[in-house]
Amino acid sequence: MNLIPQKIKERVAQYVLQFSPQVDRLRSGSSLRQMKSMVLVYADHDEAKYKLVRDIATYIKKEYGVKRVMRVAYIDEESKFIPAWHLRKLETDYFCKSDLNWFGKPVSNVNPLMQEPFDVLIHFDPDSSVPLDFFVMASKAKMKVSNHSKLRTKDYDILLPTTKGDNWKQRNHRIIQFLAESPLS
C-alpha cells in the first residue's frame, strides 16, 4: 500500500533537488582523446536503448581510446522486475526504484559511482527522471555535459542546445562530436 501519493512524492523530490547544494568537485575540461574514464547516464526503457548506449560506449572506446566507459541506467521498475538482459557487469550498472529513498534519491549501490572522479559525465536524458538528476547532482565527475536541461542547469559545465526536429540519437551524437572536436585541455 502506497501511503504517500505519487504526485506529492514527485513534488517533494523536485523541491529537494532544486534546493540541494552543488557537490564540491575538481572541475577540469578535456577533449575526448585525452580522457581516461567517463560515465554515460541514461534512462533505460527497453532493450533497444540498452544496446544503443552499449554501442555508443564501444564506439567511444575504439574511436577515441577512452580506457573506461561506464554506463549507468535508471530503470523505473522494482528490482524484481528488472529485465534479464540488463545485468550488472564490469562497465555497466543500473539503479531502480528499490535503490531510492522515499523521495527518489539514489541511496544504495550507485553511491561508489557518484564518488568516483570520472573525467566526464554525459547525461543522455536530462530532465527525464528525478533519480537521474540526483545522480548527476551528486557525481564528482570533473566535467558534466548534457543537452539542454531545465531543472538543474547549475550541475552542468556544458549544456548544448537542442535543434528542432532532432531525435535522441542525433542530440547525443552532437555531444560526442563536440567533446571530440573541442579544444578543452
Locations of regions flagged by a protein language model:
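Active-site-proximal region of nucleotide-activated glycan assembly enzymes
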Residues: M1-K7, T153-S185
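Short N-terminal or domain-adjacent regulatory/targeting segments
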Residues: N2-S37, E47-K51
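Short hydrophobic segments within beta-strands
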Residues: L40-A43, V72-Y74
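Gly/Ser/Thr-rich loops at beta-strand to alpha-helix junctions
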Residues: D44-A48, S128-V130
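Histidine-anchored nucleotide/phosphate-binding helix
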Residues: D46-G65
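Short, charged/polar "capping" segments at the starts of alpha-helices
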Residues: A48-K49, E77-I82, T153-K154
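Conserved nucleotide-cofactor-binding alpha/beta core module
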Residues: K61-M114
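Active-site and donor-binding regions of nucleotide-sugar-utilizing enzymes
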Residues: Y94-T163
